[in-house]
Amino acid sequence: MSKVKHIALIKFKEGTSEEQITKIFDDFLDLSENVPGIEDYVAGPNCSPEGQSEGLTHGFIMTFTDASARDAYLINLDHEKLKTAELALVEKLIIFDIEL
């Protein structure tokens, strides 16, 4: 089975504090350490000099062992709670998965 890269690109709503953003990413890190099938998690602000981010300011990437691990994560209750909290702060979100 192929690994899956789960990519989230985010533009937070105006007025969202750095502390709120850090908490969201820390909570996703905690989640990634407790959900089976997640091999890696990285997150941070956009640092591209190309100017093609279309306002997206932050992102994260999770690497899953396979598509079934990703699918289990998507319906995980802790993920659902965290997603709800995150979406309250998000103006724009793009999710893109790549099978390796």
Residue ranges and their predicted role:
Residues 1-57, 65-75, 99-100:
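Short S/T/G/P-rich N-terminal loop/turn motif that feeds into the first structured element of a domain
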Residues 37-41, 85-98:
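Conserved short beta-strand edge segments in small beta-sheet-based binding/regulatory domains
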Residues 67-92:
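C-terminal structural segments of small proteins and small subunits
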